[in-house]
Regions:
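Glycine- and acidic-residue-biased ligand/ion/polar-headgroup-sensing regions
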Residues: 67-89, 128
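Short beta-strand His + acidic residue motifs that chelate non-heme Fe in jelly-roll/DSBH
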Residues: 62-65, 81-85, 108-115
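Short, charged/polar low-complexity linear motifs in solvent-exposed/disordered segments
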Residues: 57, 68-70, 82, 100-102, ...
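Ser/Thr- (and often Asn-) enriched beta-sheet segments in non-cytosolic proteins
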Residues: 29, 38, 84, 90-92
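N-terminal low-complexity or simple alpha-helical regulatory segments
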Residues: 1-68, 74
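Short, acidic Gly/Pro/Ser/Thr-rich loop/turn segments
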Residues: 60, 82, 131-133
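Alpha-helical bundle regulatory/interaction domains
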Residues: 94-161
């Protein structure tokens, strides 16, 4: 079976994380005196990754990077997360909140805080250039336009809800 290209590392500060390959996925971890963060990322198929996150710290000072064609859906299962973006906007998520948005603008760069020092969440990352190739193989060219579907949530804006 062909290995599925990982795109999650293209938007993360890998120098801050330890990385290890496990069966069917990758674990990214950060251990500091202030706490821990762990992400278990699974490639679903080309251009789509599902990531489970668990954090037990107040803040992660990182510089998430934009990636043209990247769309994400986030779900906060437990705890709380706050992302302060370079454009001055702030995203707050509490338990059972969902957010969607494009991660392709330079203003996507952000830092992250966890006011309760605890967070569990899931995110679905869709890298449109690769995912569209896979969808085209399954259902035929031009049958489904992933960017158009994602824009129904964000209407070409950076953030949906």
């Amino acid at each position: 079976m062909n290995a599925v290209e990982k795109f999650k590392p293209k938007v993360m500060d890998l120098d801050m994380l330890s990385t290890r390959e496990v069966e069917h996925g990758t674990i990214y971890e950060m251990n500091t005196p202030q706490g821990k963060a762990k992400m278990h990322s699974y490639p679903v198929f080309g251009g789509v990754e599902l990531t489970f996150q668990e954090v037990t710290m107040k803040e992660i000072r990182h510089r998430a990077k934009p990636l043209e064609g990247m769309f994400e859906i986030h779900y906060c299962k437990e705890g709380r997360i706050e992302c302060a973006f370079d454009n001055g906007k702030v995203l707050y998520m509490d338990e059972n909140d969902i957010s969607v948005g494009w991660k392709e603008s330079p203003s996507y760069v952000h830092s992250t805080k966890f006011p309760t020092a605890f967070y569990k969440g899931i995110n679905l990352s869709i890298y449109i250039p690769k995912a569209q190739e896979m969808v085209n193989k399954f259902v035929g060219n031009d049958s489904i336009d992933l960017r158009e579907i994602c824009n129904r949530f964000c209407n070409d804006f950076e953030f949906g809800f």
